[in-house]
């Protein structure tokens, strides 16, 4: 890891930790904390983070597919830390196989900024389940996801390689197009099944299919 990378990760990753802590302190727990849903969310997000497929000149992961129902599966204050931990778990196999150094797992915090925006929007709107959340709020949550992710990425890339915001937008527009296409599928799974546990399980075969076509 270069000096610029260390500065970027401390800045962006540290900012995420601060934001997640602020959310946890200010956003009320809309339902009780249960171990099984938290573990299910953790596992689903970790599995999704392992699925990579090419998009334009880069790649993306379909994590938004399960992230949407996770927003309604566990209390909102837990979504950000669970997301960051899941990304770390998703990177463990690569560490074990020697593909990446253990220090790369610390990138998980900076890569989890996309979770902050939707949490804030849903908490502000008082949303507790997919069925009763207004469509405009859902669109706002998706937009907030893109905004916080782009903001964090822009800061990171500015520090590392001096990239402009315009260059960042050009790089991620295809990634966000994929996210925009997958998010409604995750929402549909949450809408048609009143039990969010099964909503996530229903999406696992699709993740497997995406993984198959990505190889």
Tell me what each language-model feature is.
Residues 1-59, 65-170, 174-179, 183-212:
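Short helix-perturbing small/polar motifs within transmembrane alpha-helices
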């Amino acid at each position: 890891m270069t000096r610029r990378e260390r500065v970027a990760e401390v800045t962006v990753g540290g900012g995420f930790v601060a934001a997640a802590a602020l959310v946890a302190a200010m956003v009320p727990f809309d339902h009780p904390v249960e171990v099984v849903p938290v573990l299910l969310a953790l596992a689903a997000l970790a599995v999704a983070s392992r699925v990579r497929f090419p998009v334009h000149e880069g790649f993306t992961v379909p994590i938004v597919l399960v992230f949407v129902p996770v927003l309604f599966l566990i209390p909102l204050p837990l979504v950000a830390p669970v997301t960051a931990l899941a990304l770390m778990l998703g990177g463990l196999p690569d560490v074990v196989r020697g593909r990446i150094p253990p220090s790369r797992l610390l990138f998980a915090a900076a890569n989890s900024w996309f979770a902050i925006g939707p949490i804030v929007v849903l908490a502000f709107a008082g949303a507790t389940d997919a069925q009763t959340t207004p469509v405009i709020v859902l669109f706002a949550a998706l937009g907030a996801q893109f905004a916080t992710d782009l903001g964090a990425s822009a800061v990171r890339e500015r520090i590392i390689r001096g990239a402009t915001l315009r260059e960042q937008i050009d790089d991620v527009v295809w990634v966000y197009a994929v996210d925009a296409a997958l998010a409604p599928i995750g929402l549909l799974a949450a809408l048609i099944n009143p039990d969010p546990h099964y909503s996530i399980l229903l999406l696992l075969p699709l993740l497997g299919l995406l993984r198959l076509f990505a190889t």
